[in-house]
Swiss-Prot record:
It is found in: Cytoplasm. This is 4-hydroxy-tetrahydrodipicolinate synthase. It catalyses: L-aspartate 4-semialdehyde + pyruvate = (2S,4S)-4-hydroxy-2,3,4,5-tetrahydrodipicolinate + H2O + H(+). The record marks 43, 106 as: Part of a proton relay during catalysis. Its main location: cytoplasm. It comes from Zymomonas mobilis subsp. mobilis (strain ATCC 31821 / ZM4 / CP4). Keywords: Amino-acid biosynthesis, Cytoplasm, Diaminopimelate biosynthesis, Lyase, Lysine biosynthesis, Schiff base. GO terms for biological process: diaminopimelate biosynthetic process; lysine biosynthetic process via diaminopimelate. NCBIfam families: dapA. HAMAP family: DapA.
């Protein structure tokens, strides 16, 4: 089972190209900060603006740089089932431990369509799959009932839940079993999510505060919820500020404030965060005692 603080990695760019040197350094920072796994090529990694060749290369670089120190859960989502399967097969070949597969976006399949999509992938994928439910981005929302059906398939081992509905953690635990890996997709809800049966977070904030995020998850796992609450108070302004503009723009800005070699460059249609967002990020970094 995947547990703890799992950064959803940003993908650094410079002059329009993948900045491999900076990315490798970022991977090392995440691991040295206590992260328990890594997720490249997800939403935070701007996978939507990568070519398939770039996607596969970034994934492979991440796996190479980890050197087996932590597992890699590769972003393998697409709204084309066969493309998603191709990503899963490439991830397996590169050495990923699992694939994170977001609900198909834009084409808005029915619940039966979602079941067909994931069951096809489960039948054909060489690695385990975690379902990623983020209705705010996909306009699709997997039901507890559909999730329960899918959880019976051996290759479907868990989910990243960014639905924003905290009560679902209990409903999904009862429907899918306590061994079904539930990871929060919302940093600001991670404390409550873990208290209700979650086992970690695929985190945006961990890009900026890997050690604090890992310490927070460790406190939750050890039932030290007063310690976890203190860390949540320290991190909460950052959780909020990092979504004060289109993600991952604020995250990249924060990293550029912390590391001189990290460019805040994004790919269109994303643009730099507003001055207001930058001010919120600066204040949050100060509150967390990171600057």
């Amino acid at each position: 089972m995947f547990t703890g603080s799992i950064p959803a990695l940003v993908t650094p760019f410079r002059n329009g190209k993948f900045d491999e040197v900076v990315f490798r350094a970022h991977v090392d920072r995440m691991i040295e900060g206590g992260s328990s796994a890594l997720v490249p090529c997800g939403t935070t990694g701007e996978s939507a603006t990568m070519t398939i060749e770039e996607h596969n290369y970034v994934m492979a670089v991440c796996i190479d740089q980890t050197k087996g120190r932590v597992p890699v859960i590769a972003g393998c989502g697409s709204n084309d089932t066969k493309v998603s399967l191709a990503h899963l097969r490439h991830a397996a070949k590169a050495g990923a431990a699992a694939g994170l597969v977001v609900l198909p976006y834009y084409n808005k399949p029915s619940q039966e369509g979602l079941y067909a999509h994931y069951s096809y992938l489960a039948e054909n994928s060489p690695i385990p799959i975690l379902i990623y439910n983020v209705p705010g981005r996909t306009s699709s929302d997997i039901s507890v009932e559909t999730l329960a059906r899918l959880s019976r398939l051996p290759a479907i081992v868990g989910m990243k839940d960014a639905s924003g509905h905290i009560a679902r953690v209990s409903a999904q635990r009862l429907a899918c079993g306590s061994d079904f890996c539930q990871l929060s997709g919302n940093d600001d809800m991670a404390l409550a999510f873990n208290a209700m049966g979650g086992v970690g977070c695929i985190s945006v904030t961990a890009n900026v505060a890997p050690k604090l995020s890992a310490d927070f998850q460790k406190a939750c796992a050890e039932n030290r919820y007063q310690d976890a609450l203190a860390l949540q108070d320290r991190l909460y302004p950052l959780h909020s500020a990092l979504f004060s503009d289109s993600s991952p723009a604020p995250v990249k800005y924060a990293l550029s404030r912390l590391y001189s070699d990290f460019s805040p460059e994004l790919r269109l249609p994303l643009v730099q965060p507003s001055d207001h967002s930058k001010a919120l990020v600066d204040a949050a970094l100060s509150h967390a005692r990171l600057i």
